[in-house]
Amino acid sequence: MVYSVAMNQSYSEKTTLIDAREMGEALDSIEIHAPEYAKAKAERIHLDDYRKVQLALLYEHAEGRTVVEKESWCKAHAQYREVLTEHANAVERETALYWKLKLAETQIEVWRTIQASRRREAQIL
């Protein structure tokens, strides 16, 4: 859905850019993406916690005599880096779905504003 408006369009032409069909699409988008977003957020939160657990498990087997040496060994370990990659992917997915939902909500708000403006304009005329 692209809402670019040419400068030479009248106000009434601009207000027809968002119609009932597109409102339905925005609502459908929310219905589709809300459960996906919830799942992505749950996955990201799980990986936040799992990252800490993985670090603790690796720390038990860490090489080094000081805490700093052990932490460095753990954070350089392939298993920990794998968890970090999974976490980054989860954050990316959650963020993408969040913005899809936000876009649909914004489209609905624009439509509502246009409808309110039309009602006010009809009262004036």
Predicted stretch roles:
Residues 1-2, 125:
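Acidic, gly/ser/pro-rich intrinsically disordered tails
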Residues 2-35:
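Short, charge-rich amphipathic alpha-helices with coiled-coil/heptad character
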Residues 9, 120-125:
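Short acidic DE-rich linear segments
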Residues 19, 33-35, 67-69, 83, ...:
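Generic alpha-helix initiation/capping and coil-helix boundary signal
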Residues 24-27, 113-121:
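Short A/G/S/P-biased low-complexity tracts
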Residues 37, 44-72:
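Extended alpha-helical coiled-coil "stalk/arm" regions
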Residues 41-44, 48, 52, 85-118:
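Long amphipathic alpha-helical coiled-coil segments
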Residues 64-93:
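Short, glycine/alanine-rich amphipathic alpha-helical segment
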